[in-house]
Amino acid sequence: MPTFDVVSEVDKHELQNAIDQVNREIGTRFDFRGTEAHIEKSEEELILVAESEFQLQQMRTILDTKLAKRGVDVDCLEAKEPEIIGKRARQSIQVRQGIDKDTARKIIKIIKESKLKVQAAIQGEQVRISGKKRDDLQQVIALLREADLDLPLQYINFRD
């Protein structure tokens, strides 16, 4: 029986490379000269540090551009409100990975409403789709691409 998995993952190496590129560009740009603007990365979070909110916005634009060039979907980033304290501005950006239970339920609901002859099961932070025909699975992929989910999805382990 053909199956595939629906996941939401971020390539950590590409993310780190994009952050390094942004930090390098910030060091050479004229509008950031003499400031201590940089991006710090922890496990699942990016922290943008600058001297003003305008510089944070510029850093976010540069980050989005570099991520897009490296093939990382920008929708996986969830920005929080910037904190401005004196001459320091910080913004925390959460890197979302994995499909949470609510989104997995939405995916299963969308599949069931389509009345395709496939089964969907939640397996941790991914959803496994199985069906008798490969065409049905391809229709499910097309259906999920058109669905309005606020999370970038990847389709892996397509097996016959």
From Swiss-Prot:
A Pfam family that the UniProt record links to this protein: DUF520
Protein name: Nucleotide-binding protein Noc_2254
MF annotations from Gene Ontology: nucleotide binding
Function in brief: Nucleotide-binding protein.
Signal peptide annotation: none
NCBIfam families per record: PRK05412.1
PANTHER family assigned to the protein according to its UniProt record, in alphabetical order: UPF0234 PROTEIN YAJQ
Family, similarity comment: Belongs to the YajQ family.
Organism: Nitrosococcus oceani (strain ATCC 19707 / BCRC 17464 / JCM 30415 / NCIMB 11848 / C-107)
Superkingdom field: Bacteria
Claim: Nucleotide-binding is one of the keywords in the record: yes
Keywords: Nucleotide-binding
GO cellular component, as recorded: cytosol
